[in-house]
From Swiss-Prot:
The gene is yheI. The lineage of its organism: Bacteria, Bacillati, Bacillota, Bacilli, Bacillales. Inhibited by ortho-vanadate. Residues 19-304 form the ABC transmembrane type-1 domain. Residues 337-572 form the ABC transporter domain. This is Probable multidrug resistance ABC transporter ATP-binding/permease protein YheI.
Length: 585
């Protein structure tokens, strides 16, 4: 049960002073709270003996006031230190988790659902935070407060009566221990189910347009209801165990009261105890109700926190597949890029996705990569970006193996515009500035012009300050593509990669963007992956991919002379463009 505290030992060591202050003040409050019941018993005995005076009354009132003020002040400070520490721990763990997620490679996200990761960063961290706040409170308060009360009752009143009154406690300890083991297991299942539900909601909200387009609202709601019912059932199993704690504690506390009153009255009749001492004893016994309940809550909180921390640590313990070199090469800028006999297989694939890929790109050249869907075009780029562990063969920059180049430096050279154009829920300007945070307005306008976005920009309601919505939902596909291109151009990268990034624009706009890139990126390397071959006519080298291998290679003219797939596809596209132009006329 307490293994969660051991797992969080690094935090308690780092912030030992905060928790030491909290615990010392909490213990001091516990000791101070022992005095009022004893004073009450003394006052009753004074009244019974006829020795109670006005001065005595004022004395008791004064003592009560001082003790109450001391408890109030110390309680404020221990609560501030203790619960402030819990919030701090949650902040540190959440920051650590987020930083870890940002270093993960694609295989990690292929194995883990986004909704479940969100649940680990919210619900699970809250459960762990509760452990370092309320959990520590109940641990210290329930054990030390109960021990203080126990010793006070024994030394100041009667050890005989004290031992008799705590006879039910071992039974309670056994019962609560059994409940705790069940809580850990069932709470883990409930959190896993909640993570799956969270992921389902995320998918439904982000894909609501597709759901409506295919009239699947009813089916989606049905699946959601099934998952909600599953979460409900698992939480009810947790609640069932939760509901056993309080009745168990109440039953055993009642037994303690019964023993205390019955046996205490017997001792009073035998003159082994005064009436005032019996009253004080029962007040102390009443004060033990909180720590007894707290023990039940302690088991509950600790087991929940332990289950949640295990889920968080499971994510944090996942090591990225792609790491920085231990001895990085001192390469300031990329030169020639050489792929030499590169083969690669995705972790989830059963066959090679790239086979014996070899080609050389001189610095400043433009490379076009064409081919059917799934032919391996994007896989080549993922190897260039080091998104996956390397396969066979080698990739070098200026003769330096790609594995010897620090990831930040490598990706800092590259401006990548992927197939799925992700825009952030910010303004158009903020999305473009993502490529260069300190860019001037002139640089922003230049990037917009190069991406051929000026005309569309004037049509937006607030121009550059227009909010694009979640993932750019307020924009058309072509607009999202051009903002993504402008964002990449803003960084003026040494290597620009356009991964089918012109598919949503017309041929005229595509030609204008390609023209701007050629004019403004002289001396810098560009990769263009496309299905529309007009986008790569000007390329210095064109690779035609088919089934993970290079089926054809050469310039535009050389490939036309080959009478292969490239020529057939090019002539078909030219005919289609001519027919479109004729229809438009």
């Amino acid at each position: 049960m307490f293994s969660v505290l051991k797992k969080l030992g690094w935090f308690f060591k780092a912030y030992w002073l905060r928790y030491t202050i909290a615990i010392v003040l909490l213990l001091a409050v516990n000791v101070i709270e022992m005095f009022p019941p004893k004073l009450l018993g003394n006052a009753i005995d004074d009244m019974k003996a006829g020795a109670f005076t006005a001065e005595g009354l004022l004395f008791y009132i004064g003592i009560f006031f001082v003790l109450t003020a001391a408890v109030y002040i110390m309680s404020y400070f221990w609560m501030h230190q203790l619960f402030g520490g819990a919030n701090l721990m949650e902040k540190i763990l959440r920051t650590k988790l987020m930083g870890h997620l940002l270093t993960m490679s694609p295989p990690f996200y292929e194995k883990n659902r986004t909704g479940d990761l969100m649940a680990r960063g919210t619900n699970d961290l809250q459960a762990v935070s509760l452990t370092t706040g309320f959990g520590i409170l109940t641990l210290v308060d329930s054990t030390m407060f109960m021990m203080t009360i126990f010793l006070t009752m024994g030394f100041l009143i009667s050890w005989k009566l004290t031992f008799a009154a705590i006879i039910p406690l071992p039974v309670m300890a056994i019962a609560i221990s059994l409940y705790g083991s069940k809580i850990h297991e069932r709470f883990t299942e409930a959190q896993n189910a909640f993570g799956a539900l969270n992921d389902r909601v995320l998918e439904s909200v982000s894909g609501v347009r597709v759901i409506r387009a295919y009239v699947q609202e009813t089916n989606d709601v049905r699946r959601f209801n099934e998952m909600t019912a599953d979460v409900y059932q698992k939480n009810m199993k947790v609640a069932f165990i939760d509901s056993l704690f309080e009745p168990t504690v109440k039953l055993l506390v009642g037994a303690s009261y019964l023993i205390g009153l019955g046996y205490g009255a017997f001792l009073v009749f035998r003159n082994e105890l005064t009436l005032g001492e019996l009253v004080s004893f029962n007040v102390y016994l009443g004060m033990m109700i909180w720590p007894m309940f707290a023990i039940g809550e302690l088991i509950n909180v600790m087991q929940r926190g332990n289950a949640s921390l295990d889920r968080v640590n499971e994510t944090l313990s996942y090591e990225t597949d792609v790491t920085d070199p231990k001895q990085p090469a001192d390469l300031k800028e990329p030169g020639d890029i050489v792929f030499s006999h590169v083969s690669f297989t995705y972790p989830s694939s059963t066959s090679d996705n790239l086979q014996d890929i070899s080609f050389t790109v001189r610095k400043g050249q433009t490379v076009g990569i064409a081919g059917k869907t799934g032919s391996g075009k994007t896989t080549i780029i993922k190897q260039l970006l080091r998104q996956y562990p390397p396969g066979e063969g080698s990739i070098t920059f200026s003769g330096v193996p790609i594995q010897q180049i620090p990831l930040d430096r490598l990706r800092g050279w590259i401006g990548y515009v992927p197939q799925d154009h992700l825009l952030f829920s910010r303004t158009v300007k903020e999305n473009i500035l993502y490529g260069k945070q300190d860019a001037t307005d002139k640089e922003v306008q230049q990037a917009i012009a190069e991406a051929h976005f000026e005309k569309d920009l004037h049509m937006l309601p607030s121009g550059l300050e227009t909010m694009v919505g979640e993932k750019g939902v307020a924009l058309s596909g072509g607009q999202k593509q051009r903002i993504s291109i402008a964002r990449a151009l803003m960084a003026n990268p040494e290597i620009l990669i356009l991964d089918d990034s012109l598919s949503a624009v017309d041929a005229k706009t595509e030609a204008a963007i390609i023209k701007n890139i050629r004019e403004n990126r002289k001396g810098k390397t560009t990769f263009i992956l496309t299905h529309r071959l007009s986008a790569v006519e000007h390329a210095d080298l064109i690779l035609v991919m088919d089934g993970g291998v290079i089926a054809e290679r050469g310039t535009h003219q050389e490939l036309l002379a080959n009478n292969g797939w490239y020529r057939e596809q090019y002539e078909r596209q030219q005919l289609f463009t001519a027919e479109e132009g004729g229809a438009g006329a």
